[in-house]
Amino acid sequence: MATDHAAPTASEYIVHHLGHFSTKHQDKIVDFSIINMDTIFWSIFAGVVGCLFMYLAARKATSGVPGRFQAAVEMIVEMVDNQAKSIVHGDRTFIAPLALTVFVWVALMNSLDFLPVDMFSAFFHAVGLDSLITHHRVVPTADLNGTMGIALGVFALMIFYNIKIKGAGGFVHELFAAPFGIWLAPFNLLLNMIEFAAKTVSLAMRLFGNMYAGELLFLLIALLGSTATAFGFFGHVVAGTLWAIFHILIVFLQAFIFMMLTLVYIGQAHESH
């Protein structure tokens, strides 16, 4: 007897898992009316987990011999604070906690990539929601909309600190006068606008590209395991294990790089040309 639903091909499987649970189908390359609900949900979820993580660390903090959890959190806080001290020369009252927030949040969002790729598809099918939630992606940083949103937040902070430190007049003067003098004001303005845009776009694209590639490789490994052969299953287990171990480095390295670039860009606001 024929089955009701034929098994998807490899390309259909990948395309399905790279789709988003959105407010509507995307027909154009750029459509600001579309909201990826899965990206928003998992971003908030990672943020809540991060806040709970730090709250528990603060609650359990002791001046005596720290436990493993407190020691791990203290290592992260000290690492971030040392990086902030070496990069930002000025008041770091807000910047160091900001960098810590960025690192923990991005690391947690990246870590969602370790969840099995078919886990939520199977869950939605089991509870009868597969007809409503036809697509679902778990990793917010594998969505360019998510990384661009964070990068735009960093861009807003760059502008804020430039105005706060140099004053509105000083910031505008720097836009027109640096780096080649006021006589080349139009060229200076264009160059500075390109610099701000390049920083924002590259910050978003770097994180997105690495996490998207990692997610795609996990899908390919899952396809390898779906082959009905002993070799396919063995290759799936070996490749999946090795890539998951290597991906741990990528997850936290990308969070560290994003945090460092955030510090560098905000730290540049404390300097004048």
Swiss-Prot record:
One of the GO biological process terms: proton motive force-driven plasma membrane ATP synthesis
Gene name linked to the record: atpB
Chief site of localization: membrane
Protein name: ATP synthase subunit a
Pfam families according to UniProt: ATP-synt_A
Protein's cellular compartments: Cell inner membrane
GO cellular component: plasma membrane; proton-transporting ATP synthase complex
Assembly and binders: F-type ATPases have 2 components, CF(1) - the catalytic core - and CF(0) - the membrane proton channel. CF(1) has five subunits: alpha(3), beta(3), gamma(1), delta(1), epsilon(1). CF(0) has three main subunits: a(1), b(2) and c(9-12). The alpha and beta chains form an alternating ring which encloses part of the gamma chain. CF(1) is attached to CF(0) by a central stalk formed by the gamma and epsilon chains, while a peripheral stalk is formed by the delta and b chains.
Source species of the chain: Janthinobacterium sp. (strain Marseille)
UniProt xrefs under HAMAP family: ATP_synth_a_bact
Annotated family: Belongs to the ATPase A chain family.
Cross-referenced NCBIfam families: ATP_synt_6_or_A (TIGR01131), PRK05815.1-1 (NF004477)
InterPro entries named in the record: ATP_syn_F0_a_bact/chloroplast, ATP_synth_F0_asu, ATP_synth_F0_asu_AS, F0_ATP_A_sf
Keywords of the record: ATP synthesis, Cell inner membrane, Cell membrane, CF(0), Hydrogen ion transport, Ion transport, Membrane, Transmembrane, Transmembrane helix, Transport
Entry membrane topology: Multi-pass membrane protein
Transmembrane segment boundaries: 34-54, 94-114, 115-135, 143-163, 171-191, 218-238, 244-264
One MF term in the entry's GO annotations: proton-transporting ATP synthase activity, rotational mechanism
Functional note: Key component of the proton channel; it plays a direct role in the translocation of protons across the membrane.
